[in-house]
Amino acid sequence: NPKNIAVFGGRDAEIVISQCKKMGFKGEIWPVNPKRKEINGIRCFSSVRDLPEGPDASFIAVPRLPAIEIVKELNAMKAGGGVCYTAGFREVGKEGEKLEKELLDNVGDFALIGPNCYGMINYVNKIALWPFDHGGEFPGFGAAIITQSGMLSNDLSTSRRSMPFAYMISAGNQSVLSL
């Protein structure tokens, strides 16, 4: 149950913040963007180093090279874990494979979902590290769904005819945490 989340990026960060607010997340949200003063009315930090402490959870939606550096810095801060939404790793070929290895070499103890994934929704604790509008609400029970596919998990999250969900994870490349 994260007390705080750091959100790295621009437009996708805005959506994650909106989704967390919509769900009723009560913890602190720390947007990180060196080019913006605020996102969704919340003051931005310029870098990982400017955060007050290692965040409990993070959402990373920046280009590949900065994503690797962010993961390295979050690991050094003993941050809890996070989602790397960033694509362009091994799914794009040899160059991406090298970058994914570099990501892995820097992840350390940082629990990472992805890269190249939609993220996770925790309906129980009201947190959505997920860059899309989603449906669903937590009625006190529900299934946990883990998929490799972002599109499948997104379709399930917006369906009003299926069973309720407690947790939803799109695992993407599964570089660190795997199915």
Language model features with spans:
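Catalytic-core regions of core metabolic enzymes
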Residues: 1-179
